[in-house]
Amino acid sequence: MQTNRRNFLKESAKAGSVIVAANLLPLDIFASDEKVDKITILHTNDVHSRLESFPLDGSKNAGLGGVASRAELIKTIRAETEQVLLLDAGDIFQGTPYFNLYKGEPEIKAMSIMGYDACTMGNHDFDGGMENFSNQLIHAKFPVILCNYDVTSTPLEGKTIPYKIFTKGNLKIGVLGVGIELKGLVPDNLYGNTIYKNPIECANKTAEELKNKGCDMIICLSHLGDKYYDDKISDEILAKECFDIDLIIGGHTHRLFPEPRKYINRKGRDTLVNQVGWAGMHLGRLDFSITGKKKKNLDNAHSFLLGKKNVK
């Protein structure tokens, strides 16, 4: 009986050692081995031909913005981050003498040099007329993505696409684009025969196609505006009425969100909306983790203030 008790105590001590050792091991040893991939989304909107920073004149925006500081930050992030997409939500043109003189050529060239992956069109991108925008696309090394403008029989025919799928490591990222209704906002002669179609219907149809093509994440570049006090279609309405869009990169209303807004879509899942002001004063950064089951987690959201303020 004494021997059995001694053996019991000895075996109990061994078991206790195993339990203690197990508690000291990293938790991830017992975690699922499900693969997690990461993607970083950098984005701008409503840059409005602001190639240089605001003048150092003591005003509120003095020294802010400019492509030099944006390009430097983008280069730094790409050097530190493996998978990056750089996107713009429209209104590239109009707002400084650069557009008045050169009609958008330096803006498009600058975006190409910075390595933008895609953009959509804003209403001010029609300000030089459709033929002008078409001519400037000669300098673009990135696609213009729009799914709710029918540009058949216009100078832009064949020069926009409804979506594009980007392969980033193990991930397939689908990007679509929607634009605002032009009638009453843009002079008729500047958008010509462009036919505006319901952006919610077009976005849902395009997103479903991207989902069926196996995209792990679906992003909408939108120039609808974040929200309105009437029933005008906005990013907020699109987020609530969509089925498969994970992220809406917005523009038009020049809002600087302190953090992405979260909405529940038609499938009961999260759709995020973000926007980063105007004039290229900010660069948005969103870092996502995506599991093999296509579950998205926003790890980090930040808007970088670009340029240096003149302090007097």
Indicate where each model-derived feature is located.
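Acidic, metal/ion-coordinating pockets
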Residues: T3-K308
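Hard-cation-handling environments
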Residues: K312
